Structures are given as structure tokens and as C-alpha cells.
Amino acid sequence: MLGPFKAAAIVGIGVSLTSFAPPPVFSAAALKALDPSRIATLFCGARRAGSSLAQNLLVAAAFAAPASEGRPIPLFPDLATSPFPVSTDKDNARRYFSQGLLLTYGFNHAGAVRSFREAQRLDRDCAMCWWGEAVALGPNINAPMDERDREAALDAMDRAMALRSTSTPMERALIEAVAKRYSRDPGSDRAALDANYADAMLDVARRFPGDDDVAVLTAEAVMNTSPWNYWEADKKTSVGRSGEAVRLVETVLSRNPGHVQANHLYIHLVEASDPQRAEAAADRLANPSAPSAAHLVHMPGHIYQLRGRHADSIRVNIA
């Protein structure tokens, strides 16, 4: 049976084993247990968990500090160097913003919120530091929005909107887009809000076609309107606007193949269609530039398992 810490590595919850040698021989049972597509069925987009593996994953998740954790989150050097040109004159606020953005990309939303809040503490006038919290508290392809976070998201959105006059045009566009994601009406239609946000982000992407982060943020907004449902049964016809998300991500990869979120989202987008398309993206993530974002380290396993690269799949899941 997989223990909770090895199980945690499979889905990218902060476990890191630096090395192992010699290369092990894996049984058929081990390969099945570590099959990312099987685990994805349990957790990535699923709404139930009933296996011992699932229970171990839940135990491991309990070790992750919630967004409300009182202690400041530390800076991780590999997460503090995003090229996103956030408007702040406080160096550590910039580093925490970068960390929050990369943790958001790596689906560690609780860690992202804590990072953005530390950036806010360091620079109360950083509009994008509040924008980041509003983004990280929203729904994602693996989980719906927790209604307990709605007020915090609204507060962060309001603060970002109030401060946006000193931001760059691109930052203002992102802030105004996230304002379409939330409503003060608790009975509002979440699907409609997600569609509004995707529409707004597509407009931002059209205004700033050369920005890679805008492109991937837009792609994810589109993906959230149809989570884990991007292809028709023929595996060739895209569902809804999923094709637009694929186009945006492929555009980023064509000019910046090392962009971690472009590689991450591309795996999610095409694994159920033609996983070979994302094999190069998987190989790039398998040599991580942000090893502290454990979910990103795990992601190549989705493709490797489908491509028959079982040893590689196991390697990245216990990295």
C-alpha cells in the first residue's frame, strides 16, 4: 500500500524525495497504483474517493496549511522569479507575487493565497497582489469554488479594483476581467460567472496577444467553463471553446516552450485526445524549473502512462 507521503507526491502535495538508485523493477500492481490516469479519475475532476489510495491522499492533504494559516509562508527561491512585470517597488512583494502566481499555476491554491497575502502585507498598494488572491480563490478544473471563500474573493477583487488606477493597462485589464468572475448575490449562477470571466479574458488576450501569462490565464479561464471535458467522443472535435484554449497554449509553446503553465495546461488539454501531442511538454516539465511546485513535477506522468513510459511516470511521481 502506498503511504500518505508517497501518495502525496503523485498529485503534487509538497513531498520531495531527491533521488533513488538503482532503477527499480515495478510490478504490474505498482504500475496500476501509480497510473496517473487512474488517480485523475479519483481526484482530478472526480467528486468522490473510496479507495485506500484516496484515503492516503486525503491524509497527505491535511498536512497542507490552509490559506488562513497565521504564519507567513516562506519564499521558495525557485518560485520567486516569475518574469511577470508586476507593478510594485517592493522587491519582496514582487517575489511573493511571483510565488503566488506559480503556485496558482501549480494548483496549490492555498499556498498561492498565502503568498499573495504576504505580498499585500509588504505593499498594500499593489493592486495585482489583491488580483492574485481573487484569482486563486476561484474555481479550477479540479474543484468548484468553496462558497466559504466568496467574501474573501470579493474583498480582494474590490481592493484590486480600487487600486487599479496606478497599474499598467494590461494589469487593469486583468483586474477588470476578474471582477466579472464574482457576484455579491449568493444565488448567482456560477457557470454563467465562469463564462463571463472567460469572455472577459478572451478580450484581454486579444488586446495583449504577445503576453504569455495573459494567454495561459485566458486558456485556464476557458477550461474552467468545461472542466475535464474538452473533446467529443471522436477525440478530435473540441467541446465548446476548448479549441480556443488549445490555440492559446500552443501559441505560447511555439514562442516560449519553457513556460511551465503552458506545458501544464497542454497536458490537461490533449491527454484525452492525442497524448503524443503533449509528450514534448511532459519532457520539459520532467526537468522542472520550479521543483517546489510539486503538482507540476507530477504532471508528465499523465502523458508518460498513456504513452507506455511507465518507469518515467513513476520517476516523476516520486521525484
In which residue ranges do the predicted regions lie?
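Sequence context surrounding c-type heme c attachment/ligation sites in exported
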Residues: 294
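N-terminal alpha-helical interaction modules that lie
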Residues: 19-266, 271-275, 279-290, 306-319
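Bacterial N-terminal signal peptides
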Residues: 4-19
